[in-house]
């Protein structure tokens, strides 16, 4: 076959690859036991696929890390990241911040505890902050295998004092797993500050277009990489080559997109604070945010992310609920209600119907701010608020 000098890695949809001879087949399968990131010979797409490896290298460049393992969803990334530390009866306890993605908390309750019978502990925030005296007490008492947290919580956008958390956990020899979906490698690279693994729901900002589902685990330790590749291979947590190819094109605009997300969110949060229909705006870039100092210390002048949470004014639970619903209805054709985030288009999500008893706040809405023209966004949202 004639060699084609393509400027981009092609889309390889093959389920398996031609090994050509028995000798080469034996060598390929022997080498496969090493679970290298990029094999000399590709065998089967559930093991490794060249299109996927190319996208992984792009993420490695963004994270400034030695390896990245792409999977089909963010939840698959979480499964791999925590499961590679499990060793049957010798599995040690683990400690999770409670202010993490709701799906992760369900995974903890319904998989790690209910089905795997693991010893899992949680650390709770108090009044929008993390109590480090309590965190150290738990680390000392539990002696966990790892500590799992998010740099920016969802939906209250609590920014963690991550360097202090990592330093404290290291004193107790706990590994560090960070879900940095909200922060992204644009704002913070956890591995450079001592984290052992960083995970992302690639579905969100890294992809940014709402048309693929994917997750990724990143690290520097080669043994953890081999464990992650083996777990992905044996559980089938593999991203499709088509999605990996699409992701590869989307990653090229990631930094440009995310800067615009940050710029728009800061401008919109400032705008919302001045609206008489709004009771509270939560955005880490605002002086009113309880963890603005932590956000500035962590992110510097790069931005504060693309998420805003705000609460409408109201005289009662029912009044707030009705105003929330009118606001959502007024934007139905322009800013849709979609339970995801990080897309180029602005989308919204009501808090109480999703988080329930954890956040029984009927007037509260989460905005995933897109990269549209900011003046148009202000006009749309201002017009909806004027109908309250």
Where are these regions (language model features)?
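Hydrophobic side chains in well-ordered alpha-helices
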Residues: 55, 81, 227-228, 323-327, ...
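Active-site C-terminal subdomain of aminotransferase-like
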Residues: 20-21, 25-27, 32-39, 44-48, ...
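PLP-dependent enzyme catalytic core of the Aspartate aminotransferase-like
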Residues: 66, 115, 120-122, 126, ...
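Acyl-CoA thioester-binding alpha/beta core of soluble enzymes
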Residues: 1-35, 53, 69, 86, ...
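Conserved PLP-enzyme active-site core in the AAT-like
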Residues: 5, 12, 67-277, 282
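Conserved N-terminal alpha-helix of the aminotransferase class I/II PLP-enzyme fold
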Residues: 16, 21-76, 80-84, 103-111
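Residue-level signature of catalytic and energy-coupling elements of molecular machines
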Residues: 150, 327, 367
